[in-house]
């Protein structure tokens, strides 16, 4: 138990966007418990925009700076560090910097050498969601560590940057609308499809995205296809098939603007990627496509938010463990299931 309130706390999570999003509730809980404590969040430069969208984080700390410079948290020497993602080099660096309280887990041998507060926590064998596991680590700070998924989904409060007017105009575009003015509706549901995952997870077949696009009524839906510039070539078969029905926004926006675009849209469909978790955290309709196999199942990685849903087969076959690209569990998720959910959501707008 803490003897005094810390001046500041560093949350260390230096992996991908989705992992970072699922760690942001830790900042919210720390701020609720210690309102006067400055919260620093350490990550990689490419996740900076999503970290800075969190109102409970006072400052972003680049892990490269942390490893090579004497960093501060809002001008103060670091007081506490939470190793949410265990990284040996970061743990040893935190000890070398003399951070007074260094919190890690008992199942990392190097944490016994580098941390002075240890939490009994094994992610590998846990039945908990990743966000619930993240909230277990601050236990030595004397705060509540058990949260339901519904409670966690209410903790985000993300504040996106203003959306560039040029991108905002896309959400009102009449492109791909019926030629007959009598059929045009200005209140179409703005849907983002994010087919790829930069190789970070199982993906729904591109053919299923194509089928879904053909199933949706353009009188009711305005469809955008997103992805990184590097993923554009891999998406070409989709654009060849249904490019006349969608707006291609791949590689058009930096992360800050993409977050703002998701916030301004109505819904997003993706596998367990960063954009899916961003959409859920923003309170948008977030439709996640998952395989039922551990450790990538929705029990661990489902998007959290008031309007998040997951689509997953009940039974796992495990045939794709050696060939994730040929995942029959993902292929078994029917486009018609997504169509039904999207039409139900759109009926609340149109």
Give the predicted meaning of each segment.
Residues 1-350:
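Catalytic machinery of carbohydrate-active enzymes
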């Amino acid at each position: 138990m803490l003897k005094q309130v810390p001046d500041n706390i560093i949350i260390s999570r230096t992996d991908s966007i989705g992992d970072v999003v699922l760690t942001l509730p830790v900042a919210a809980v720390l701020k609720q418990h210690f309102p006067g404590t400055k919260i620093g969040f350490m990550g990689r430069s490419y996740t900076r925009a999503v970290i800075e969208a969190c109102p409970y984080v006072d400052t972003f700390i680049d892990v490269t700076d942390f490893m090579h410079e004497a960093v501060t948290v809002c001008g103060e020497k670091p007081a506490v560090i939470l190793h949410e993602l265990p990284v040996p080099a970061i743990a040893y660096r935190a000890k070398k910097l003399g951070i007074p309280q260094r919190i890690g887990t008992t199942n990392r041998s190097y944490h016994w050498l580098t941390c002075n507060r240890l939490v009994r926590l094994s992610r590998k064998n846990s039945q908990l969601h990743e966000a619930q596991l993240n909230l277990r680590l601050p236990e030595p700070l004397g705060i509540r560590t058990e949260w339901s998924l519904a409670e966690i989904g209410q903790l985000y409060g993300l504040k996106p940057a203003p959306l560039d007017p040029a991108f905002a105009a896309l959400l009102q575009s009449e492109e791909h609308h019926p030629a007959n003015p009598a059929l045009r509706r200005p209140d179409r549901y703005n849907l983002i499809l994010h087919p790829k995952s930069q190789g970070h997870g199982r993906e729904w077949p591109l053919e299923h995205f194509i089928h879904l696009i053909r199933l949706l009524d353009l009188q009711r839906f305005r469809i955008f296809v997103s992805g990184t510039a590097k993923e554009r070539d891999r998406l070409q078969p989709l654009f060849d098939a249904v490019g006349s029905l969608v707006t291609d926004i791949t590689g058009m926006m930096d992360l800050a603007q993409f977050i703002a675009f998701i916030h301004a849209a109505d819904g997003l469909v993706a596998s367990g990627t960063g954009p899916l978790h961003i959409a859920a955290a923003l309170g948008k309709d977030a439709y996640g496509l998952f395989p039922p196999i551990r450790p990538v199942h929705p029990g661990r990685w489902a998007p959290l938010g008031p309007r998040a849903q997951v689509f997953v087969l009940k039974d796992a076959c495990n045939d794709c463990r050696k060939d994730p690209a040929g995942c029959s569990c993902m292929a078994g998720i029917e486009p018609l299931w997504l169509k039904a959910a999207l039409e139900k959501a759109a009926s609340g707008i149109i």
